[in-house]
Amino acid sequence: MMTLKAMLATGRILSMVILAGVSMVQPANASSSAVLQVKHTQNSAVIPLYEVLEIAFQHEAQYENPFFDVTIDVTLTSPSAKQIQVGGFYYKPGLWKARFAPGELGRWTYRLVFKNTRGQTASGDGAFTCIKGRKGNPGFLRRHPENPYRFVFDDGTAYFPIGVQDCWGDNNHNGSVLDVFSMEGPFRTDLKEPPALPPGPMFLRGPSSNPQNADIFFRSFGQCGFNLYRFSQKNCSYDLYRDLDHYLAPEGTVTDELLQAARKYGFRVCYGIFGYQKVFNNEPNNTEGLAKVKRFLKYSVDRWGAYVDFWEFLNEQHADDRWYEIMIPYLRSVDPYRHPITTSWERPYLNGIEINAPHWYQREEELKSDQVTAARANEWKKHGKPVVVGEQGNTSDRKKPIPGVGGVWDDRSALRMRIRNWTALFHEIAFVFWNTSYARDGHYMNIWLGPQERQYVRAMQDFAYRLDKDVMMHTVKVSQPDVVRGYALASEHRAGVYLHHFHDHATRVEGLRLDVDLPGGTKGYWYNPADTAILKIVDISAGMNDLEVPPFTVDLALLVTPEGAPDIDHDGRPNHLDTDDDNDGVPDDRDAFPLDPSEWADKDGDWIGDNLDADDDGDGVPDDNNENGIPDYREMDLDGDGVARAETIPWDAFPLDAKEWRDTDGDGIGDNADPDDDNDGFPDAQERQAGTDPLDPLRFPTE
């Protein structure tokens, strides 16, 4: 008979009743009926590096406040004998959980203590083995060890952030915020006295195809290069507590699901702990109040720390410096991952605030988009810390809005965004865009993001990731400085140049030359930021290069790399030889959005792709392509597969594909066609043969 210790050592036991075979402490005068009975299980005996171990505690006793009346302490011992402390949290009636993402390979052990306010205690032990997964996880984000403005992952690989955020709420009260999401809609039809719109196909009022769902949102943005998601409670979102003595269990659960969904689609998470909640910001001497703030900080770390990369204390709030002097060390003391910390309003001069996170809304003249971005970047970087602009977008005067347009969008918005983004990349800062896309006139500020904006981001991110983690700002000299501004990045092996024609965006720049010091023995690729076209390939020599610049109208980039020509869809054909750069099956010359694989047609030219356009031809009559008398945008199951696209659980992740409705791993391939649904590196067929779960990335055959 194998002992409990032996079973734990081999990982063959995944659950244990704490009452049996482990220590139990109870009051001396307690009856047998007062024994604290707890059962704990763990989600797997084998956890890939940086993936999440989850321990569940089943306990049926009733408590007045189960968030506070039960305390769970987990002491983990790493393979190198380091001890790490994490806490548990209340999940739902009868269930508590604890989470941990291991960052060291080998066998881990842990000791559990579960106690309540009645003086009862139960304790137990467990173990798991941390392995390197077949599909590697690069770890959490860290400040670059040599460049204070860049980030790298734990494994040392590069990270070039570009972020997005939006509103969330369970407005239909079905227990999820993911089944309803609003994407690119036209100008609204529900205004009582709508202003006249400018002429042109992009300025039309009509219905939208909303609601959609979060799978469509995260897939559309993730596959185009967005890789940072910012979320905070009470910030166009739900609250996580009624007050600091009463936490909300359902809202905690939907936050779990939201962060897990973002990570599934490749997003890293900037987590705002308090948002707009007032938390004794200007009462640093309120010991009782600050103790409650600390309690919620620890709850947040215990519950979400395994999914988060950056912590953000507040959103657009002022707090006394002494409040931060108390809270920063406390957050650092309870966070086993040492995630970088920021806040808003920004306080970059404070010790312990590791990211400068200003907010910036502007509708500048597009010819100055690079100039104003560069000026702000230089100012924000004076503190020697990474800069992630926590909110970025357009704006207009609320009292004097632009006639007929609103604040979130105009027909030059995508271009301004493109120029800002490229300039930000070359100044070592990043933006998080506040997305308000349910309507083009939905607000007086924020930004409307559609397929045009997404494909511009995809072009830039593909360029960025062909650089390396060590690129830093560099000097470039242009021959026509009264017409073109130039910016450069370079490392020992790679380099990039970005040129903006700021004189006008209508005539071509010709005869331009630039002087720049570059790594040699490689090729340079003149790259169009609008569509990734390779305009010219040149030989690069080590040292100063005097280069002839191909003619261009708005902007142009130069990529210097030894890795060969850019290939944005990784299909083996470089961009200048590839007739379908987004690999969506529609040739680029017939693709309205050749870099966005979610859209390819735009019949009315309104920059809303036909897949999400409720009126494809812009005639004011909603589409009814199946001719059943019901406008398509009102049909929840347009593809007829029996799964509605929104307002239900489960929802259809592929609402226009009758053969697909679920995407377990967020790779853009529906489970019915995907040979590895959970993306754990083990084909589904192999998992079924081995008896493991092909939909669970932590359940796979033992190698």
Regions found by a protein language model. Name each.
Residues 11-23:
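Bacterial N-terminal signal peptides
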Residues 31-80, 86-88, 127-133, 142, ...:
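Non-catalytic, glycine-rich low-complexity segments
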Residues 36-47, 62, 395-397, 405, ...:
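Aromatic- and carboxylate-lined catalytic core of secreted/periplasmic carbohydrate-active enzymes
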Residues 53, 96-98, 545-547:
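Short strand-edge motifs at loop-to-beta-strand transitions and within beta-strands
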Residues 71, 117, 138-367, 372, ...:
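Active-site mouth of glycoside hydrolases
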Residues 75, 84-148:
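Extended acidic/polar, glycine-enriched regions
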Residues 295, 315-455:
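Extracellular glycoside hydrolase catalytic/binding regions
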Residues 564-703:
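Extracellular calcium-associated, cysteine-rich motifs in secreted modular proteins
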